[in-house]
Regions:
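N-terminal leader/propeptide and maturation segments of large enzyme subunits in energy/redox metabolism
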Residues: 1-29, 145, 150
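Terminal presequence/propeptide segments associated with secretion/organelle targeting
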Residues: 8, 34-35, 72, 85-86, ...
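Electropositive phosphate-/nucleotide-binding environments in soluble metabolic enzymes
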Residues: 20-28, 85-89, 136, 140
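Phosphate/ATP-binding catalytic cores across multiple sugar-kinase/actin-like superfamilies
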Residues: 28-37
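Flexible, glycine/threonine-enriched loop-and-boundary segments that flank and lead into catalytic domains
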Residues: 36-58
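Short beta-strand elements
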Residues: 52-71
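Hydrophobic core positions in small helical hairpin nucleic-acid-binding modules
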Residues: 78-79, 83, 92-167
Length: 167
């Protein structure tokens, strides 16, 4: 175990101090990126007429962002759902792309982000909801909605290269 060997060599206090520094650095990088953003909202319409809706509010004084998915479609009986962890991963990815520095992904990235994801929505689906499209289609649509709300969306083939099982 690499962490155990580092603790044995340097001591727990030193290892924890470096771990905290990595998280603090990531947090500061995200906060700096937030200061350059503008508030926005986006509604991504799905083929079935439902929406992934997101509003992003920026507090430039606190250097925090609120990402609010209120109004997003409820979970559906098909496989176009994702668990909340997928939504969190997408948020982490999007905000990480806005950072100009080379930082590792870690919990510090989330500290300046206030996330609101409605219960039982298609991006916070719980068992027994089908979620096979969650890691592909739904995650990409959520990503596009976030980039749209931030005003940095660019056209691409999105998930046109995927093969999906189920209905």
């Amino acid at each position: 175990n690499e962490i155990k060997s580092m603790i044995d060599q340097f001591g727990i206090e030193t290892v924890q101090a470096y771990m905290n520094h990595v998280q603090d650095n990531a947090e500061e990088c995200i906060r700096n990126a937030i200061t350059k953003l503008s508030e926005g909202k986006y509604e991504y319409e799905l083929d079935n007429g439902e929406f992934i809706k997101v509003t992003i509010r920026i507090d430039k004084i606190k250097r925090e962002a609120t990402i609010d998915f209120t109004g997003t479609a409820e979970k559906n009986p098909f496989n176009y759902n994702a668990p909340m962890a997928v939504c969190h991963a997408v948020i982490l990815y999007v905000f990480r792309t806005l950072v100009g520095n080379n930082i590792p992904l870690n919990e510090g990235c989330f500290k300046p982000l206030n996330i609101i994801i409605p219960n039982n929505s298609m991006i916070n689906a719980k068992y027994p909801s089908a979620v096979i499209a969650g890691n592909t289609e739904v995650s990409q649509l959520t990503c596009n909605a976030l980039f749209g709300a931030l005003g940095v969306i660019a056209g691409s083939q999105a998930t046109m290269n995927n093969f999906i099982w189920g209905r």
